[in-house]
Amino acid sequence: MKTTLDLPDELMRAIKVRAAQQGRKMKDVVTELLRSGLSQTHSGAPIPTPRRVQLPLVHCGGAATREQEMTPERVAAALLDQEAQWWSGHDDAAL
């Protein structure tokens, strides 16, 4: 996934230097650093386990037709479309 981050200049220089010293791509160095940072706990405390939440149940008038059914593929396509609209600055899919 591509994303844009606004990082301090000194941080980017350090990442570039590390990548050059290790003969690696910057994206690989950043990925490694993010994974390492996210796997560490703060102040020695264990990472909390995710808690279960209860989502609301939405009742509909009837069963969805095959064209209306929300398959994983349709959800992924809708999310990609929404992200593309967001990046283009036109959020027509806003609720």
UniProtKB/Swiss-Prot annotation:
SUPFAM superfamilies: Ribbon-helix-helix. This is Antitoxin VapB41. InterPro entries: Arc_rbn_hlx_hlx (IPR013321), Ribbon_hlx_hlx (IPR010985). It comes from Mycobacterium tuberculosis (strain ATCC 25618 / H37Rv). Antitoxin component of a type II toxin-antitoxin (TA) system. Upon expression in M.smegmatis neutralizes the effect of cognate toxin VapC41. GO terms for biological process: positive regulation of growth; regulation of DNA-templated transcription. Keywords: Toxin-antitoxin system.
